[in-house]
Amino acid sequence: METLLGGLLAFGMAFAVVDACPKYCVCQNLSESLGTLCPSKGLLFVPPDIDRRTVELRLGGNFIIHISRQDFANMTGLVDLTLSRNTISHIQPFSFLDLESLRSLHLDSNRLPSLGEDTLRGLVNLQHLIVNNNQLGGIADEAFEDFLLTLEDLDLSYNNLHGLPWDSVRRMVNLHQLSLDHNLLDHIAEGTFADLQKLARLDLTSNRLQKLPPDPIFARSQASALTATPFAPPLSFSFGGNPLHCNCELLWLRRLERDDDLETCGSPGGLKGRYFWHVREEEFVCEPPLITQHTHKLLVLEGQAATLKCKAIGDPSPLIHWVAPDDRLVGNSSRTAVYDNGTLDIFITTSQDSGAFTCIAANAAGEATATVEVSIVQLPHLSNSTSRTAPPKSRLSDITGSSKTSRGGGGSGGGEPPKSPPERAVLVSEVTTTSALAKWSVSKSTPRVKMYQLQYNCSDDEVLIYRMIPASNKAFVVNNLVSGTGYDLCVLAMWDDTATTLTATNIVGCAQFFTKADYPQCQSMHSQILGGTMILVIGGIIVATLLVFIVILMVRYKVCNHEAPSKMAAAVSNVYSQTNGAQPPPPSSAPAGAPPQGPPKVVVRNELLDFTASLARASDSSSSSSLGSGEAAGLGRAPWRLPPSAPRPKPSLDRLMGAFASLDLKSQRKEELLDSRTPAGRGAGTSARGHHSDREPLLGPPAARARSLLPLPLEGKAKRSHSFDMGDFAAAAAGGVVPGGYSPPRRVSNIWTKRSLSVNGMLLPFEESDLVGARGTFGSSEWVMESTV
């Protein structure tokens, strides 16, 4: 019966254990330990129904994102926790607080960005911490505080760490393995590994280290180390893949005897890319520091901030220190700050800071110094003559305090009242909207003034403004004032008080003034209106000028059009038709029986065309023959020839037309001579010849002749038609003259006028002898150009 009850009890306990196992997990009951295995089950969170007596919990290969405090609460017996290969990005603080028995924690291959101070709190017995292949960018200084003395294996490889809590690492005295490879470490504090006597493996591969601190622990990494003990095993040290700066600071590492691990030099330029262990020891050199830039002199008002700069170069980069004038090393404090670039900031200067500050740049190769002179302008303090002592930390003299005290001091106590400042010691003139000129004067009994202090404030905001003025100046222009505002201005004189060895001050005088009012909007509007008015005026002037010019052109055009017809009409008033070669008789004829006068001589001046030499000779021969026939007919006159023409200017259209017109009138006079043989024609010819002169051009003055050749409107044209009379040409060709009368001329049709020939460039269909008659005497049947006057 007892055996049956024992079997039932064991079965019930096994059933209870199996029933407590989470879904998709495997629970193992191995003697006294209980294991819960849930690897790669696709879990999104830690199962809440895990047996709290679990000793080994494996949750790797899932999709857990968040770890909370309830996930591992009351698991005091948990020894091994695996959370590898998840997507954990956040661990709530104190989530492992109850895991006091945990020996191994695997958080590798997750997405942890950092480890806070309380992330790993409570793991007092932790020996193995594996946090590689995460996204760690920083680790808090107190993150490893609870297991510093128990930790044996720390793996932080394949992260983004720029630094570590090196003070915590220094205290991990039981650490056996430290993996820091494939990070962004660029500096290791000196003495970090001094107490890690049990360290057997140190991996610093693929970081940004340029140098390593000369620690004795690295001596155990030599290949010939025979002094290894269980408490001091040989060190496996790897530091390949770092840009080592091969100078004198790594000479100690080069002297170690160890196997070549393909470490290379990253700098300086002459050794870049060379294998570290192949570089000779004499090539590991350094350069002493050189100060390239520093502040020389600095003048600061007491109580204000001061900045001293000092820059130096060297190999390795030198460290810069500052020494105060009292030979005190300046460090970081509430009043001063020293930066890595060599700058010293003094936030509040005192009189003790006056003197020479020394900048010291030092490295492994030596040091260099530079001096900076600092002059402190001390704050003004009340003189002994004022019977007052200024507070130790008082600021510059206040207008409201100093001036009011001096005015009302006579009624307080029985002491002697202070002397009032002289009348009108300070004058303010040339006041504008934003500036004013202050002038002052001091008495001869005043001690030697070291400097003047000008104080002024605005009546609106009561902000006091100070200006320090050299003792040689007795005037100062105050700028940047507010328009239309009242100001209180005081001038103080400062000198050295020999009794107190401090700077004493006394009021020279005060004044009040108001700045002029300014109207920026109105002034802006006025300038805009003025600018627009100027544009309109200039535009109006341009338009008016154009209109006047157009009106002048139109008036001139109209006057020319009205004057031209009248002048042209006057020029053609004596024009008559010569269709038949006869001239109408004038109103009064010559008396009968008067001897016939010779034809008037027509003087062809420079208006004639300059024909070719051949045409001129032909014209002369034709003229001689024509005059010879005239003498045979009983004219009784000598042959009439044109005088030789003077050199003429270049012909133009005006001269061409004038020449043709002169030839036309000359032909008419020749016909009158021929007609004068008859009794009727002789009287008419005598009357006609009495109106012309051989000295006057037939077409009038040149000006009138030029105007007569201008084109006229169609309604004002005087038309005159001419034709060829071939009778005389035929007679001349036969060599005689028909006696006893005048044969009617024969008309020739379809003949081009001379103007048409001159315009169209065509030649007349006649012989050259017919054309040269224009230069000699003309018969009654000679052709005349058709012209429009």
Swiss-Prot record:
Glycosylation site positions: 29, 332, 341, 384
GO cellular component terms given for this protein: cell surface; postsynaptic density membrane
UniProt xrefs under SMART domains: IG, IGc2, LRR_TYP, LRRCT
Topology of this chain in the membrane: Single-pass type I membrane protein
InterPro entries found in the cross-reference section: Cys-rich_flank_reg_C, FN3_dom, FN3_sf, Ig-like_dom, Ig-like_dom_sf, Ig-like_fold, Ig_I-set, Ig_sub
Disulfide topology: 310-359
Bias (Gly residues) ranges: 407-416
Chain ranges on the Extracellular side, renumbered to this chain: 21-534
Span of domain Ig-like: 289-375
Gene3D superfamilies listed in its UniProt record: Immunoglobulins, Ribonuclease Inhibitor
LRR repeats: 53-74, 77-98, 101-122, 125-146, 150-171, 174-195, 198-219
Self-association state and partner proteins as the record states: Forms heteromeric complexes with LRFN1, LRFN3, LRFN4 and LRFN5. Can form homomeric complexes, but not across cell junctions. Interacts with 2 NMDA receptor subunits GRIN1 and GRIN2A. Interacts with DLG1, DLG2, DLG3 and DLG4.
PANTHER family: LEUCINE-RICH REPEAT AND FIBRONECTIN TYPE-III DOMAIN-CONTAINING PROTEIN 2, SYNAPTIC ADHESION-LIKE MOLECULE SALM
Family: Belongs to the LRFN family.
Protein's UniProt name: Leucine-rich repeat and fibronectin type-III domain-containing protein 2
